[in-house]
C-alpha cells in the first residue's frame, strides 16, 4: 500500500497528461472546420455555430464536471467525460452527410461536455496529490493541453491525406474515437483522490480556506482570475479557425 501511494501521484499525472493530449478540441477546431463544412454540407456560418456550441457546452460542462468530481470523485466525472467525448467522435463519423444539421447535437454538445468533464477532474485530482507542488501538477497538465492542439492538427491533416483505413474527416473521427476510448478509459480508472490522512498531513501547518461556491463568487480574487481567463482565452479559441483558414493548414477539396 505504501509503495502504491508513492507511485500513484506520478501515475495520475501521467494519465492526466495522456488524456489531455487527446482532448484539446476547443483549441484545435480550426483544423476541423473546413473538412466538416465540406463533408456535412455546412456553411462557414454553420461551422462557426458548431464551434460556438462546442465552446458553450465546454463552459457549462466545466461547472457540472466540477460538481460531479466534488460529489462522486474524479474517476466518476472522468468516466462520464470519456463516454460523452468518444460518443461524440463515433456519432460524427456515422452521421449521414445529408443530416449535417444534426452535427451540433451529435458532436458539439457531447464532445464539449465530455472534454469539460475530463478537465476539472484531472486538474483537481493532480493538485490534491501534489498539494505542495501545485505548480508542477498544473504545468504538466497545462502543457499537455497545449500539445493537444499540435497533435490533433497533425493527426487530422494526415487523415485528410489518408493513411491505411483512415480516410478523410470521417476516418479521423473514427480513429480519434478508437484511440481516445482506451487511453481515456484507462487513465480515468487511475484517478482517485488521496487518502484523507495524506491530505491532512500535507495541509498541516497551513491556513487553508475552503469556500462554498457562493462565498467564492464574493471574493475579489475570483473575479480577477475570471477576468484574466476571459481576456486571454479568445486568443486561442476565437482566432484558431481564422488562423488555420488563412494559412491554408486545411487541405483543398481536390486533395481529399
Where is each model-derived feature located?
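Extracytoplasmic gate region of multi-pass secondary transporters
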Residues: 29-33, 220-249
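Helix-to-loop junctions at the C-terminal end of transmembrane segments
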Residues: 62-73
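C-terminal ends and interior cores of transmembrane alpha-helices
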Residues: 84-97
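Hydrophobic core of transmembrane alpha-helices in multi-pass small-molecule transporters
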Residues: 102-116
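Intracellular juxtamembrane helix-capping segments at the cytosolic ends
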Residues: 117-130
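Helix-loop-helix hairpin linking two adjacent transmembrane segments in secondary transporters
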Residues: 145-192
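Flexible cytoplasmic inter-helical loops of multi-pass small-molecule transporters
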Residues: 193-211
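Single conserved hydrophobic/aromatic residue that forms the stacking wall/gate
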Residues: 248-256
Amino acid at each position: 500500500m505504501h509503495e502504491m501511494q508513492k507511485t500513484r501521484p506520478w501515475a495520475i499525472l501521467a494519465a492526466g497528461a495522456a488524456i489531455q493530449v487527446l482532448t484539446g478540441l476547443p483549441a484545435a477546431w480550426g483544423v476541423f472546420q473546413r473538412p466538416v463544412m465540406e463533408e456535412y454540407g455546412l456553411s462557414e456560418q454553420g461551422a462557426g455555430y458548431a464551434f460556438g456550441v462546442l465552446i458553450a457546452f465546454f463552459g457549462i460542462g466545466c461547472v457540472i464536471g466540477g460538481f460531479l468530481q466534488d460529489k462522486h470523485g474524479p474517476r466518476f466525472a472522468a468516466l462520464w467525460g470519456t463516454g460523452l467525448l468518444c460518443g461524440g467522435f463515433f456519432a460524427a463519423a456515422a452521421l449521414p452527410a445529408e443530416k449535417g444539421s444534426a452535427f451540433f447535437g451529435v458532436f458539439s454538445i457531447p464532445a464539449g461536455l465530455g472534454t469539460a468533464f475530463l478537465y476539472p477532474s484531472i486538474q483537481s485530482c493532480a493538485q490534491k496529490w501534489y498539494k505542495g507542488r501545485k505548480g508542477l501538477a498544473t504545468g504538466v497538465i497545462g502543457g499537455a493541453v497545449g500539445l493537444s492542439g499540435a497533435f490533433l492538427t497533425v493527426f487530422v491533416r494526415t487523415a485528410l491525406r489518408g493513411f491505411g483505413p483512415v480516410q478523410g474527416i470521417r476516418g479521423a473521427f473514427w480513429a480519434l474515437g478508437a484511440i481516445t476510448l482506451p487511453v481515456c478509459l484507462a487513465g480515468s480508472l487511475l484517478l482517485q483522490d488521496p487518502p484523507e490522512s495524506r491530505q491532512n498531513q500535507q495541509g498541516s501547518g497551513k491556513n487553508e480556506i475552503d469556500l462554498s461556491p457562493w462565498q467564492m463568487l464574493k471574493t475579489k480574487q475570483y473575479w480577477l482570475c475570471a477576468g484574466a481567463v476571459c481576456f486571454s482565452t479568445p486568443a486561442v479559441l476565437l482566432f484558431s479557425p481564422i488562423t488555420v483558414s488563412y494559412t491554408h493548414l486545411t487541405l483543398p477539396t481536390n486533395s481529399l
